[in-house]
Amino acid sequence: VSQDAQNDSSKQIQYIETAVNGGAEAVICLPVDADGTQSLIDAVGEKNLVFVNRPPTNYSELAADNVTYVGSNEDTSGYYQGEYLANYFKQKGQKEVKYLMIQGTLGQVSTTKRSEGVIKALKDNGINPVEASAPVVADYDRPTAQEMIQPLLTSGKEFDCIIANNDAMALGAVEACKDAGVEINFPIVGIDCTADGAKAVQDGDMAMTVFQNPVGQGKGAVIAADNMINGKKLGTGMEDLGALDDSGKDYSDSIFWIPFEPVTKDNVADYM
């Protein structure tokens, strides 16, 4: 049985309680609110709960024996962007890069991790990142990103690249550039490798994106749920997905990462 909570935390709790009362041994859940996951854990009671795609803000909640998480490590998604940009600008002989950043929804783990990751990678690779302007917040929305970037383009602001927390916002920046008559002779980078994002990389409008594997996450969540129900080791069957446990933490057996993959013009055909 599948239910859509329509971004409503109270509905999500209700659906979990209904599933458990109806005899479900495990529930797979993409939490509406990463800060409110303890309520979902309470709702599932002694049954099994698999969080997918969006982890609890408080990872220690995963220490419970009947709770696990399957997703992709956001620490690496932005880092792949930064590695690409560092290599690009090193080849141009630049050691300092002025960037415009388009962020998703503030407070979300993905926004924070992706934004921090790209800057860390630039610094780790010997590039000094400098804000050309304060980050704009577009809530992962394409039209909002287009609207927010437009005035920065027409103001004559100097920058070397545009970094977006996802493909939709990167594509909004592409549209803003085209509307303003700005030649895209600088890298615009995104994350998720959506169909439109991959096409933009192929066409040269975006320099790169980062593939997040939704099928792998879904399969991993189902495998984890089955393992929990049948008392198997949680990682059983995860090997073919390339899943990695988070071995540095005491709740490592409850976290499984489905790897992100960098996508450029060289390999984008493999993702279309």
Model feature map: region roles:
Residues 98, 102-106, 110, 125, ...:
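Hinge/cleft segment of the Venus flytrap/periplasmic-binding protein
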